[in-house]
Amino acid sequence: GVLWFSTWDGINRFNGYDFKVYKARQGNKITMTNNRVDLLEVDPYNYIWLQTYDYRVYRFDQRTEKFEQIPAEGEEEGMRFSSIKILPDSVIWLLSENEGAVRVKTNPKDYSITTQVYATHSRGGNAVHINQVFSDAYNQEWLLTDNGLLKITNDKEEPVSYFVNIQSGKDEPVQAFYSFC
């Protein structure tokens, strides 16, 4: 196996003998917009997911040594991600501070990805901030938000809402959820 390290100057792979540095430089094909990497995660398909200092997320293919920005440029380009959550069923959630989240699913045959945006104005979610994501024993995904719970089931694309305040008034109470077990 290898070890991966995030640094302020790209990511580093250590194979037990040597280090290899991956960072954007003029003339190379690495497309990261910032070399400072604040977070690294690995998914079940052995892709490295990284979040850079400018709150962008990339998927790094260790086989081809290529970086892919997620979501792709143009798709929700302005979203700033603060965390990456990899669920046991290989679904990946990219969470932002106040713009919702992006759900990423990898096709196990060709490793292509599909993304769904769960922003504050879409998919039935009225949450401003998603605090946590997890999947239960039935592979239902739960989003704990500052305005209720959202549940995504295997048979529905739209989430089911619990304890969500749909009123637009600022002084209306909301039920925030922070943790689970």
List the model feature ranges, each with a label.
Residues G1-C181:
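Carboxylate-rich, polar loop motifs that coordinate divalent cations or form catalytic acidic clusters
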